[in-house]
Amino acid sequence: MVPSKRVYFLLIFGILIAPTIAIFLSIPTSILLTLLFDVVVLVLMLIDGLRVRRHRVQVTRELPSRLSIGRDNPILLKVRSEKVTATLQIRDFYPTEFGVSIPLLNATVPGNSTQELTYTVHPSQRGEFPWGDIQVRQLGAWGLAWDNRKILHSLKVKVYPDLVGLRSLSIRLTLQSSGVNRQSRQLGIGTEFAELRNYRMGDDLRFIDWKATARRVGTHGNTPPLIRVLEPEQEQTLLVLLDRGRLMTARVQGLQRFDWGLNATLSLALAGLHRGDRVGVGVFDRQMHLWIPPERGQHHLSHLIDRLTPIQPVLLESDYVGAVTSVVQQQSRRCLVVVITDLVDVTASVELLAALTRLTPRYLPFCVTLRDPLVDRIAHTPESEVTAAYTRAVSLDLLAQRQVAFAQLKQKGVLVLDAPASQISNQLVDRYLGLKARNLL
């Protein structure tokens, strides 16, 4: 039981009027009346608090089975009140590592009704976390006391990579393949036959299938010519090498670089599996920490999520040559090799440059780096103060050194994508779909 603000106000009021009473009566009488008044207030508070216990509300919590890192995950509290209107303060003991939209929930629930309260948690790291109980304060009918109790509702929750983003990407890819968004299937794009359809105004005459048209005319009479529609080749191999070394431990926009890279890895894997390709993933630091052989099918995505989620970055220098050597030993046929890492400059990244150029021309190497928007913002914001100007100069130099390294990679035939961390997944998927459409694999 916790006194309300009204109780403190009444007690202070009793003390303040004591001098006035002493003027008209005596000081002992004033003290006696003040004490009597305070006792009455405290007794009423006790009665008010005890009465609440007969009408305690019921509170239950509902949350997603899998929380997504870097996303606002909705948490639902259902409050059921019987007979009387309940004024409540509810605090949910979510993991302390999470950000939260509303730490303390206030609600007034009418009698014989259920009210839903929603707030969001924002995890910034993956793993398993303890979720505590629910603290509920219910105000008495006289407004003098809060009934303070704890509802046992502790459990363990798991934070996964960005599953919300994967669901959105899956919908987007499904719309593309179903024809709602027709960018993924156009005349002349791809090498595999997809379908025959009627000729439309503006179609390229080179793609008319005259044999199929002749057979159709012989069967159905005068009909429009048939056009061959091609689509990108399937059952190719896509390998993703995800760096978990020292450079990937830095935080960018609230998440570690490794987490952004892991989200991009799963997004690219989803796109590859959706396009019918075989997808394999390797996670490396000084050695190949985890190797998942290439497979096809949507079931493989669940396998990738389960295997990759527990992995965390480490403060070790990465062995890029060793990782590339493992790929060469595992995969003899031509494939797309995507290396997700970070790059500082030519000097610091000499091993990365050597490893990627080793893959050409037998493989198609693709270097993906995660740019920090804060560095971009500092570099492109004019400053008048000396200290800020030096910081800006360093940022400009970092960006220039990165561009020199990227230029060397491109000269060696390595594909390059350098994008802000929050945009890396979408841009990487778009580049992959573009490569498929142009048959570069």
Q: What spans do the regions from the language model cover?
A:
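Extracellular/lumenal glycan-associated context and N-glycosylation machinery
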Residues: M1-T60
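C-terminal signal-anchor/stop-transfer transmembrane helix together with its immediate cytosolic
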Residues: P3-F9, W210, A348, Y432-L441
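An amphipathic, basic-hydrophobic helix/alpha-beta surface used to engage anionic
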Residues: V39-H299, R334-V339, T347, A354-R358
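Short beta-alpha junction loops
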Residues: Q287, L370-V375
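Short, charged loop segments at secondary-structure junctions
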Residues: L290-D319
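Acidic, Ser/Thr-rich peripheral helices and adjacent loops at domain boundaries
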Residues: L301-L304, L374-V404
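Exposed acidic/Ser/Thr-rich ligand/metal-binding surfaces
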Residues: S318-R371, D418, R438
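Long, C-terminal catalytic modules of enzymes
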Residues: T381-S384, L396-L441
